[in-house]
Amino acid sequence: MPDPRLTTLPAPARARLLARFGPAVDAWCEALPEQVAELAERWGVEPLAAGGGGTSRVFRCRRRVDERAVWLKVTPDPQVAAEEAEALAGWERTASVAGLLAADPGAGALLLDGVEPGTPVRGQEWEPAQVAALLRELRESGPDQAPGEGSALRPLAHRVGLLFGLALRRAGPDGPDAEIRLRRARAQALELAASAPGAGLVHGDLHAANVLRGPGGRLVAIDPRPAWGDPDFDAVDWALEGVSTPEALRERTALLAGLVPGLDADRVHAWAHALGALLAAPAARAGHDDARTRFLLGLGG
C-alpha cells in the first residue's frame, strides 16, 4: 500500500485541477489514494515520489520485477488519457518519445517508461540541431494514415480552440484588450489549422519543459496533448524560445526549416504570430512588461 502522504493531493495541486476541470473533480481527488494503490498493485510498481501539472498527477515508481524507473500518470479526464495513449502507441517506432508500457484510458491511467538521465531541457542551453532531430523523428515516425473510426485523436483545430478557450477564461482582470487580442489570435490560428497542406500526428505541447535529455544526449518528448493536423505546429515553441525581435524570429524559423525536411518556415512564422499572444498571456496577467512579453503580445498585430 503506497504511503497516503505521497498519494494524497496537496492543496496547490488540487487547486490546479479544480481550475482546469471544475468542482466535479473533487470526488476524483478524494479517491486518488485508493486508485493509485490499485494501479500500483495491478502494474507491479512502487510509487516513490509525486508531482504533476494542471491535468494529471504523476508518480515516479520502481517496477518491482526489475527495479526499473517508470512513471504512473493518472488524470480525471479519460479522454486526455486515451489521446496520450494513442499518440504514444503511434510513435512506438522512435526512442525520441517516452514509451508506453501499459494503459487503462477508462481509468485515466498510463504507465510510462522512464527516461534517463531525464533532465528537462527547460532552463538549459539547447542546440538547434538536437531540436531539429526531435522534430524530424516526430514527423517521420508517426502513423502514415489518418485516425479512423474509434480514434481518440481530434483535429488540431480542437486543440487550438481548447488552448484559446482556457486563456480567455483566465483573462480576468486583463480586461477587454486581452480578450480582443486573444480572439483575433484564435481566428488566425484556426485559419492556419484549416489550411495545412498536409497532416500528421502532432504532439501539441512541445515546449522545453516537456522535453527531456535521454541516453546519449537524445532529446525525448513527454506529455503530449496530441492532435491530428499541421506538424509545423510543434516547431512554434522552439521558434520563439528566447526570441524577442522580428529579425531573430525570422532567423530561427529559417534555421529550423533548413534542418527539418518538410518544415515550412513561412507557416512556422505564421503560427508564431498566431500563438504569440497565447504564450504571453500568463506573463501579461502577472503584470510583466519586459521586452519579450511585449514582443509576443505584438505578434498578432
Where are these regions (language model features)?
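Juxta-kinase regulatory segment immediately upstream of eukaryotic protein kinase catalytic domains
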Residues: M1-L48
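An alpha-helical support segment within catalytic cores of ATP-dependent transferases
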Residues: A27-V36, P143-H203, G214-P215, A257
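A conserved alpha-helical element in kinase catalytic cores
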Residues: E30-P33, T55-R57, D66-L111, V115-L138, ...
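Active-site acidic catalytic loop and adjacent metal/ATP-binding pocket
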Residues: L48-R64, L100, A187-F233
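Conserved, surface-exposed functional patches that form binding/active-site neighborhoods
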Residues: Q130-G150, P231
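Active-site Asp-x-Gly
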Residues: R213-G258, A265
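ATP/Mg2+ or Mg2+-diphosphate-binding catalytic cores
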Residues: E251, L279-G301
